[in-house]
Amino acid sequence: MTVKYIGKTRNMELTNGKCYEVLSVERGWYRVKTDMLGDYLYPAHLFEIVEE
């Protein structure tokens, strides 16, 4: 699944408006590969789905 980050740009972790690939969904949270730090879990409300 591809999602677009709709939150604030966060210290080079995630960039507002950028699309990210969801590696897995865990208890409603998305595991995405960040811009700099590897992959982490983030709450789904911070993203909008671009492609399922």
Predicted regions and their residues:
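Basic/aromatic-rich interaction segments and small domains that mediate binding to polyanionic partners
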Residues: 2-46
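Short intrinsically disordered terminal tails
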Residues: 1, 49-52
